[in-house]
Amino acid sequence: MTNIRKTHPLMKIIDNSFIDLPTPSNISAWWNFGSLLGICLILQILTGLFLAMHYTSDTTTAFSSVTHICRDVNYGWIIRYLHANGASMFFICLYMHVGRGLYYGSYTFTETWNIGIILLFTVMATAFMGYVLPWGQMSFWGATVITNLLSAIPYVGTDLVQWIWGGFSVDKATLTRFFAFHFILPFVVSALAAVHLLFLHETGSNNPSGIMSNSDKIPFHPYYTIKDILGALLLILVLTLLVLFSPDLLGDPDNYIPANPLSTPPHIKPEWYFLFAYAILRSIPNKLGGVLALVLSILILAIVPLLHTSKQRGMMFRPISQCLFWFLVADLLTLTWIGGQPVEHPYITIGQLASILYFMILLVLMPIASIIENNILKW
């Protein structure tokens, strides 16, 4: 009798995706982040669902409803902090996942890569709208500043901003629609993730060497299910430590002050995972230029496959490109630090230099390094 998992229409899909999936035998721990992102997404949807049961999307009660969740709801505090810090873990895994793709040349699977970029934008939009919901000072002013950037679009900018706001300022209408979008977008992310996997399984996974591995593949289960469980346990450990010992470590103290349109916080800044893009935005004095740089800082990933000049796929055997990659990582950490600093003398210049370097590495230096490496190897 044939095994039900190989014949049943639904079980067959699960079997081909997670059990009998042929997987390269040499993929490292850097390939764990896909499954970790899936775990993060499930965690965020579940904790978000329970938070939505108690949250009210009205400007007069939003802040106090979050306080009520933390103080009066059974284990409400842990659900709230799992959700808030779960978002941080989500972005750590996302950036590691994208970094792995850049390092090992996974971007040559263009469909998978492009859907990944759409996923990144969608998750960023979801996180931004979620940050507005507690209706603290940073929620309100963050929403005001970021949505206001759209007014830089010629002709339609101002109308577009007022259309998003649902009025002439960030108010009740804005909060209600942000809550609605924040609720629905994770399900859009889930659907996109399924398409992302669909395209990935058309080609099969890449591996650290970047060489075709069809001749040497092993079933996903039990080898990689065990490996993924280890990664998941480590993720849960870090998240648990964060939630139970320092839940506000990555948050902003200003968000414990109820939103007040009449009082501007001294330093308006988004959550830590957007600081690199915020630093790029701030480093350009022109408003439209800043907005374009902000969008391009992520959209540049879509151009990376077109700029691949190396004869090798990954960077495993390319020392010059490796150096540039780690320069890029250091540059992004510098931008993250700058994004959290006030707009004054040394920080402005450092931010501008780091922003120029970011685009230079991806657009100019990496393609040149690849050509040099090809010539060194006489390819």
Swiss-Prot record:
What topology does the record note for this protein and the membrane?
Multi-pass membrane protein
Which SUPFAM superfamilies does this chain map to?
Answer: a domain/subunit of cytochrome bc1 complex (Ubiquinol-cytochrome c reductase) (SSF81648), Transmembrane di-heme cytochromes (SSF81342)
GO molecular function list: metal ion binding; ubiquinol-cytochrome-c reductase activity
Cofactor: how and how many bound: Binds 2 heme b groups non-covalently.
Provide the transmembrane region boundaries: 33-53, 77-98, 113-133, 178-198, 226-246, 288-308, 320-340, 347-367
- Residues binding heme b b562 are 83, 182
Residue numbers binding a ubiquinone: 201
For this chain's UniProt record, which GO biological process terms are given? mitochondrial electron transport, ubiquinol to cytochrome c
Cellular component, GO annotation: mitochondrial inner membrane; respiratory chain complex III
Main localization of the protein?
mitochondrion
Q: Where in the cell is it found?
A: Mitochondrion inner membrane
Residues that bind heme b b566:
97, 196
Its needed co-factors are: heme b
Is Heme found in the keyword set? yes
Question: What Pfam families does UniProt report for this protein, alphabetically?
Answer: Cytochrom_B_C (PF00032), Cytochrome_B (PF00033)
User: Which keywords does this Swiss-Prot/TrEMBL entry list?
Assistant: Electron transport, Heme, Iron, Membrane, Metal-binding, Mitochondrion, Mitochondrion inner membrane, Respiratory chain, Transmembrane, Transmembrane helix, Transport, Ubiquinone
PANTHER family attached to this UniProt entry = CYTOCHROME B
* Extra facts: Heme 1 (or BL or b562) is low-potential and absorbs at about 562 nm, and heme 2 (or BH or b566) is high-potential and absorbs at about 566 nm.
- What does this protein's UniProt record list under function? Component of the ubiquinol-cytochrome c reductase complex (complex III or cytochrome b-c1 complex) that is part of the mitochondrial respiratory chain. The b-c1 complex mediates electron transfer from ubiquinol to cytochrome c. Contributes to the generation of a proton gradient across the mitochondrial membrane that is then used for ATP synthesis.
This protein's assembly is summarised as: The cytochrome bc1 complex contains 11 subunits: 3 respiratory subunits (MT-CYB, CYC1 and UQCRFS1), 2 core proteins (UQCRC1 and UQCRC2) and 6 low-molecular weight proteins (UQCRH/QCR6, UQCRB/QCR7, UQCRQ/QCR8, UQCR10/QCR9, UQCR11/QCR10 and a cleavage product of UQCRFS1). This cytochrome bc1 complex then forms a dimer.
Q: Which family does it belong to?
A: Belongs to the cytochrome b family.
Q: What is this protein called?
A: Cytochrome b
The species this protein was found in: Phoca vitulina (Harbor seal)
Task: From the UniProt record, report the name of the gene that encodes this protein.
Answer: MT-CYB
